[in-house]
């Protein structure tokens, strides 16, 4: 899946140890379909060689304004006019100061100042020591650069090359790729608040064991990412899964169906879209043993009693906000047979405008899927594809229905 096909990215490197991450970022951008032109400052070349970046980008690297390859000796004009975006990764504290002051003493800063601001965005991934990051001068400079139209991609936190720990690390290449992809995505849900549930629930029998299912949460996490790419403010309620939180998404971890219900009802009060992908346990033990249930040697298994869990989707769909059209509800049905019939019946039973069906055993834990969109007008299939691609298609469908008033 090439998310950046047709995009031409100027990747600018400034002086800092985080330049080693720029090599991987370059590779990921190209893998995502972009063409990459690397421009380096003299200081950046002390940390990683132009030869390395040329090998990865497949293009000659520019390091000087006086590059003889440009017939008009204006690489700052030529390169910026070809770009769909300039990405500074890493951007040092010194380079941020130059940008804030409009100083142009080498090629990369010249390009940033000479770029057509209405069509060539500037994306900045700062990287520096924690004290440099926290210094008022640095924060003042970055605020000025943002006020001048640049987009800040933020920083990471953790161990730094100097041996200290704190904020100021350059984001990881995969995180930057996610942010860059989101930047170019159509903002069809701008201003919307999207609530997503994902993963399984776990219903405890005792402190050791419980009832759960094979849901990996991948589809729900992909939907949360796609909604964020589309410009929404996203809250993700996740059952017990081991997946990284999508960039820019607020995550609430829960364990049981009752915990998920409580979180969903609370968060749905502020949402405009609710996508219920979680595979919630239908039943839970009527009682929970405080100690491990052990074999007693009789050969007879323990007698377990169950009670039905509340229906989270149906409960939210019956809320006043959902009934009066403020909240658009989308449900998921993971079935093992008769998918269309079960999906149609489930949509009507839960009283929702759109239900997405799939065959659970064929999708749990997989990176791809196929979906059926079921509404009052019938059924439409989304053929098998990566889950993120399907998530983007689903989010586009939801956005279209909202814009048409299809609540």
Language-model segments: residues:
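A cross-family phosphate/adenosyl-ligand binding-site feature
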Residues: 1-124, 129-407
């Amino acid at each position: 899946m090439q998310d950046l096909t047709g995009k031409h990215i100027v990747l600018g490197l400034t002086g800092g140890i985080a330049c080693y991450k720029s090599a991987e970022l370059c590779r990921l951008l190209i893998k995502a379909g972009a063409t990459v032109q690397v421009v380096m400052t003299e200081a950046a070349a002390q940390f990683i060689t132009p030869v390395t970046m040329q090998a990865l980008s497949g293009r000659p690297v520019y390091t000087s304004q006086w590059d003889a390859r440009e017939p008009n000796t204006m690489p700052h004009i030529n390169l910026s006019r070809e770009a769909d975006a300039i990405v500074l990764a890493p951007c040092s504290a010194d380079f941020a100061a130059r940008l804030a002051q409009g100083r142009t003493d080498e090629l990369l800063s010249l390009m940033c100042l000479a770029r057509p601001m209405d069509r060539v965005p500037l994306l900045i991934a700062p990287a520096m020591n924690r004290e440099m990051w926290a210094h008022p001068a640095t924060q003042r400079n970055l605020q000025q650069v943002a006020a001048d139209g640049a987009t800040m991609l933020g920083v990471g936190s953790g161990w730094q090359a100097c041996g200290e720990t704190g904020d100021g690390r350059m984001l990881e290449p995969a995180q930057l790729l996610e942010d860059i992809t989101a930047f170019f995505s159509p903002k069809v849900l701008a201003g919307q608040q999207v609530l997503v549930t994902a993963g399984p629930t776990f219903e405890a029998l005792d402190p050791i064991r419980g009832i759960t299912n094979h849901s990996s949460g991948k589809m729900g996490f992909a939907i949360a990412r796609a909604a964020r790419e589309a410009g929404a403010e996203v809250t993700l309620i996740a059952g017990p899964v081991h997946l990284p939180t999508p960039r820019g998404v607020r995550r609430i971890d829960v364990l049981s169906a009752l915990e998920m219900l409580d979180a969903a009802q609370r968060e749905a009060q502020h949402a405009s879209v609710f996508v219920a992908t979680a595979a919630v346990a239908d039943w839970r033990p009527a009682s929970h043993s405080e100690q491990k249930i052990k074999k007693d040697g009789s050969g007879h298994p323990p007698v377990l009693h169950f009670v039905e869990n509340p229906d989270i989707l149906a409960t939210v769909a019956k809320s006043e906000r959902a009934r009066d059209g403020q909240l658009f509800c989308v449900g998921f049905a993971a079935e093992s047979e008769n998918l269309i019939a079960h999906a149609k019946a489930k949509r009507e039973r839960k009283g929702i405008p759109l239900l997405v069906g799939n065959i659970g055993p064929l999708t749990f834990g997989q990176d791809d899927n196929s979906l059926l969109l079921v509404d009052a007008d019938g059924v439409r299939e989304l053929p098998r594809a990566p889950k993120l691609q399907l998530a983007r298609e689903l989010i586009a469908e939801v956005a279209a229905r909202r814009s048409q008033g299809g609540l």
